[in-house]
Amino acid sequence: MKQPRIIICRHAESLEDVDNDIYNVLNDLEIPLTEKGVQQAHDFGAVLAQLLKDSEYIRFYTSPGVRNVQTLKIVLPKLSDNNNVEVEVEPLIVKQDWGKITVENRPGIEAERYKAGVLRYTFPTGESVASMIGRLTSFKEKIFGIQKDMEHDIVVFSHGFEFRVLLMIIMGWEEELFESFGNLGNCEYRILTMGEGGEYSLNKPLQKHSFPITRLLKES
């Protein structure tokens, strides 16, 4: 019997990835893909179609962010006609709300965030880490429940940081290990496969970055 999988994907390249000035023009969730991102999504659709070619039932979840929804809409037509697909726009996996971010205040906020630790920092006008972890934990429980009852493959279109936090929650990583990993690139993905005992294994580790963890330098 095929073991159910969870495939977590990051959206294709968006204007946010190439121009931070976009925050002076658009709300974060309204930021669209670039032309390069559209092509990335088409290429990724072919990859995902191959991964899912033998999957009878697939459930897709996407963040409400425009860049996530656009990526998914480009991917879906690439799938096999034999795939039975359900799609849900899921607020539980939306990007953490940083509050009022502008090109002027972003560098200072980012510096303070890394100094405090990305899982400890509180945005002055944004969403708390506890709130984000709480909703991602609820999402984990939701998809675990689905795979417990039905042999669905689940595909998640998330954001870079939230992708990593969701993996931390599922895999039980400690904070220091989590902080040692970098975010995945656009249209990168990881596959979690359920074992016979209900545990999940990761097909490929995340790449560790070479930068010191600022929070640990402060604590030493």
How would you describe each model-predicted region?
Residues 12, 160-161:
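Active-site metal-binding loops of divalent metal-dependent hydrolases
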Residues 70-71, 161-163:
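Hydrophobic mid-domain F-helix/FG-region of cytochrome P450s
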Residues 1-5, 44, 50, 81, ...:
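Acidic, low-complexity terminal tails and accessory targeting/binding regions
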Residues 9, 90, 157:
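Generic enzyme active-site microenvironment
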